Amino acid sequence: MKICIFGAGAIGGFVGAKLADAGAEVSMVARGAHLSEMKKNGLTLLEDGLDPKRITVRVAQDPLELGAQDYVFVTLKAHSVPYVAESMSPLFHDDTTIVSGVNGIPWWYFHKIGGELEGTRLSSVDPDNKQWDVFGPDRVLGCVVYPAAEVIKPGVIRHIEGNKFSLGEPNGEKSQRSQLLSEALRSAGLKAPVRKKIRDEIWVKLWGNLSFNPISALTYATLDVLCEDRDTRQVLRTMMLEAKEIGEKLGVNFPIDVEQRINGGAAVGSHKTSMLQDLELSRPLEIDAILGSVQELGQITKTPTPNIDTVLATVSYTHLTLPTNREV
């Protein structure tokens, strides 16, 4: 089984390192200083309670150097994927599976969902249908990523918490490809349940991303503060309730309620969301997949989203004022 990690940053590097350490045939696509360091000295993984592990993996900037793979984990920021989709083609053979591990509503959401919305395409996450046309939705295996990790310097990844990668076919079947990947991940010491309704799990994680992330970027507050302050908690609540109404219209079952989801965020403690970290580093913000997509789904289901619309407008302007986006 050949597994490629396309985007060997924090999460991609973590799962790739765990798989490689367990004996899987892993390659990675990376760039810059991170790529150079991994080529020279391998990838170092730091985990609490364990000695640092230096893992040698095949790594390249050009996917053509790596050849066709059985599984390709896409672990980039969602907004980056359409721009590199065509460059992934050398990694595919006829039966290659794409493991979609990005945040938010995935581009393939309406593939094999059934009903009148079957095959609907989402411009907020797949402008110009680039992923749908280049990848093809039949290749996709859904994945909800739970671990938190960070690249503390080129070639070194620190695992923070979590070890679950939930998998699921768009049509809900327990396929051979999902079972084989689940076994590989479990052999690497990770949790990898195969879900019949992966979209339900996508929405529960999205609840946190669509509210915690932008509000933290607007306030510079950590999760514990956001969830415990009366006023910011109310903003989180109203956004989640709007999203819940959309999800339920699409057939999603939410196994927990809004208060439980917010309390779960509070329990993480004094943690900066990924969007706040990106803001502080002047990196592009992951807005469309976690907010724009929900706004688009609100329009599709004729569900008003006034609070989500307001937060989307304000955090989008914040994004435009980043040094990387300012006109010189």
Task: Label each region the model flagged.
Residues P52-I152:
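Rossmann-like NAD(P)(H) cofactor-binding subdomain of soluble oxidoreductases
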Residues A221-N307:
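Interdomain hinge/lid region at the active-site interface
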Residues T318-T324:
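Conserved small/polar residues in nucleotide/adenosyl-binding loops
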